[in-house]
């Protein structure tokens, strides 16, 4: 009976505590809140997808797909290499229900297989998993009303969202390289790499071929950020506080005649390399292509904001900086003043 049950002389117990959210998770929550504040909705798609999406793709090759041994169907027979197609399925689903003005974001894993890394002793050596953030923008940015007309979304709107994420996380733009990207996913796109060559992000306009395959009428603007690489890039970022300058900033404008293949990012890079201390901002405010220009040329109107934190800049200092800047743009890009 119960009278014969042994009662231990010591009582053992354990306490559990809630584990701390890691740094990456905190920043993910921060960016999620930021995107929701910008009108985005978070989506969560299946990591399983259709191998047919990757057929003939040079960017996401069939040979890098992770196949399931016993798939439920051909629509769920591989692990995704990109978040893109899941988001396009969500856009298609909404557009078919007359909801075409959309902004989505998703955090999720992408999976890759590399046969060259295959090792009999390490079964998982050939497989890789990356954590990504995807952004989708399509349809109207502003709907028609008495206060304003319709305004469509654009790739520049998407670019602003991507750069705002980088800025919020404290990424040093001096340590990254922006470049043109040409592949079968985008019709026009930009890539963002670290100085060490690691890919941080791509963003641009989805190709008409893919858009048509999903039966989507409006252009789709898409960005994919490698979250893990971004976390590495901002690891050394520090938040610095300083008082507002007591001395006025000075703006100077240049009208530059350049080759059509030259991008604003190249001008911006040369400008910051030329004057690292006093140059605060470089902005492109006008682009002209057409009559009265040489064939193969375009005109960029660029403004440069200069400011000294400790004194008022005089004309001699400003002219010296601008002369040096003009010389570097001419030598490196063949730019001419109009």
What is the meaning of each model-derived region?
Residues 1-102, 252, 305-310, 316-338:
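Extended, well-folded interaction surfaces typified by the phenylalanyl-tRNA synthetase beta subunit core
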Residues 3-7, 26, 45, 121, ...:
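A carboxyl-terminal module marker
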Residues 9, 70-72, 109, 137-139, ...:
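Short, structured patches in soluble enzyme cores that scaffold and shape functional sites
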Residues 72, 108-111, 196, 286:
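Short, flexible loop/turn elements at secondary-structure junctions
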Residues 88-93, 113-114, 209:
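Long, charge-dense accessory insertions within large macromolecular proteins
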């Amino acid at each position: 009976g119960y009278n014969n049950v042994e009662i231990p002389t010591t009582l053992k117990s354990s306490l559990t505590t809630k584990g701390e959210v890691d740094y990456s998770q905190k920043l993910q929550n921060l960016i999620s809140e930021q995107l929701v504040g910008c009108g985005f909705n978070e989506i969560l798609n299946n990591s399983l997808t259709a191998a047919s999406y990757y057929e003939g793709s040079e960017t996401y090759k069939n040979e890098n797909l992770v196949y399931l041994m016993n798939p439920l169907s051909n629509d769920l027979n591989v692990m995704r290499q990109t978040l893109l197609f899941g988001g396009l399925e969500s856009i298609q689903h909404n557009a078919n229900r007359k909801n075409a003005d959309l902004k989505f974001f998703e955090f999720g894993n992408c999976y890759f297989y590399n046969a060259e890394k295959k090792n009999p002793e390490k079964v998982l050596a050939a497989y890789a998993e990356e954590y990504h953030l995807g952004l989708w923008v399509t349809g109207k940015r502003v709907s028609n009303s008495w206060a304003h007309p319709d305004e469509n979304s654009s790739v520049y709107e998407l670019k602003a969202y991507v750069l705002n994420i980088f800025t919020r996380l404290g990424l040093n733009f001096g340590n990254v390289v922006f470049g043109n990207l040409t592949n079968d996913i985008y019709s026009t796109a930009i890539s963002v790499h670290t100085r060490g060559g690691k890919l941080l992000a791509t963003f641009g306009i989805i190709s008409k071929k893919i858009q048509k395959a999903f039966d989507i009428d409006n252009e789709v603007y898409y960005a994919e950020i490698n979250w893990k690489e971004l976390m590495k890039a901002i690891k050394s970022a520090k938040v610095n506080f300083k008082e507002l300058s007591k001395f006025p900033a000075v703006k100077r404008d240049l009208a530059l005649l350049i080759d059509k293949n030259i991008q604003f990012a190249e001008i911006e890079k040369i400008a910051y390399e030329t004057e690292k201390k006093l140059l605060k901002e470089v902005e492109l405010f006008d682009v002209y292509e057409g009559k009265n220009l040489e064939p193969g040329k375009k005109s960029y109107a660029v403004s440069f904001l200069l400011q000294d934190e400790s004194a008022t800049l005089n004309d001699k200092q400003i002219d010296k900086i601008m002369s040096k800047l003009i010389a570097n743009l001419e030598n490196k890009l063949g730019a001419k003043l109009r």
